[in-house]
Structure formats: structure tokens, C-alpha cells
From Swiss-Prot:
The active site is at residue 67. This is Uracil-DNA glycosylase. Pfam families: UDG (PF03167). Its EC number is 3.2.2.27. PANTHER family: URACIL-DNA GLYCOSYLASE. One of its GO terms (cellular component) is cytoplasm. Excises uracil residues from the DNA which can arise as a result of misincorporation of dUMP residues by DNA polymerase or due to deamination of cytosine. It comes from Coxiella burnetii (strain Dugway 5J108-111). GO terms for biological process: base-excision repair, AP site formation via deaminated base removal.
Amino acid sequence: MTTMAETQTWQTVLGEEKQEPYFQEILDFVKKERKAGKIIYPPQKDIFNALKLTPYEAVKVVILGQDPYHGPNQAHGLAFSVRPGVPAPPSLQNIFKELHADLGVSIPSHGFLEKWAKQGVLLLNAALTVEAGKPQSHANIGWHRFTDKVIESLNDHPEVIVFLLWGSYAQKKSQLITNLRHRILKAPHPSPLSAARGFLGCRHFSKANQLLHEMGRGEIDWALD
């Protein structure tokens, strides 16, 4: 017997949204900016990597970010992740510190989080593009409407999902998660400005696995090396 989760895909839950005029306007805006010579991150082929690498039916954990990295060779479509060979930015370093303190896994030698994505960890930024060197430059071009729709579609997911909401921006999205089946864990943002105020010590990685285990969903192997 197939469950509803197995029959639903990103295409079935987001297909209509992608037909909305605003969505095409976002894509046209990004295309024009690139044509005008502006550097936009991530590269075009990577914009929807979070959805490509973590199928709807496979989502177990959601980690929300705000904006892609705006430096060269960093952003590749997964929140907090950087390409292989690129040093882990400060927030990601703090994520790894907490991972080590929580689970005892070694601090990874890289910041490439694709292994998490392929296990069902949706690494979703609220805005999916950014202009080089200009944080939040694409925050108001319509991406938030689309990524809110992604979160709303996950709220309807028939399986338990654990949402890790780090920082006040991500925590505001909890109002979209109304289904009591899901679990929400909140902590300050892992950035150096706030990590010591409660992100370090939050133990979200072990707590997420405990919740997944209790619901029979299978734990995440958070180790990256």
C-alpha cells in the first residue's frame, strides 16, 4: 500500500505555485540581473538544490536559513552549506562545534552538507538567490512567498518532520507549522553574535534523532567525515 507521502512530490505540491505570475517574475528578475553583468549566487543550476537533493517524500528534518552566502564559491543551494574546499563560515563552524559537543562526532574537515540533504534534511533558505557582496539583496523579490509555500506543504506532510528553527527569523516561520504531528525545536542563531546565548548546548542533533526514533522514521547520520 502506498502512503500519501509516497505519492506526493515537490512537483505535485508546488506545481501550481510555480505557475503563479510572481514565480516567473522572480526567475525573470534573476535572469535580467545576470544578463546585466551582476554576479548572483548560487549559480543558476544550483538555485533549487535543496528541493532536488531532498525529495518531498523523504523530508525528515528541516533547517531554515535566511539568505544564500554572498561570497565567491560558497553558496550552492543548501542553507549553511559551502562547496568542498571552501572554508566553513563562522555560523557553520558553530554548528559543527555543537554537533561535536552533542554527539561526539569529529568536527568535519569541510562544510559540504550534501550528505545531510540526501538523508532527508531539507536545508532551505528563505531567499534562494543573492547578489554578490550584498546580503539580503533578494529578500524582497518574491522568494519568501515561494519558500513559505514550501513550509506550508511540509506542514501537510503525512509523516512527522522535525523543524530546527535557529534565530528569530527562522522562528517566525513556526506560525506556518500548525500540524501538531510535527516537532519544532528552537534555539538562537549559530552566528558568532548569538551562538553563546543558547545555540551552543541546544543538542538539537541528538534531540532530532530521538524524536525521529520515537516516531519510527530512522535517524540522521550527522557525521560528515
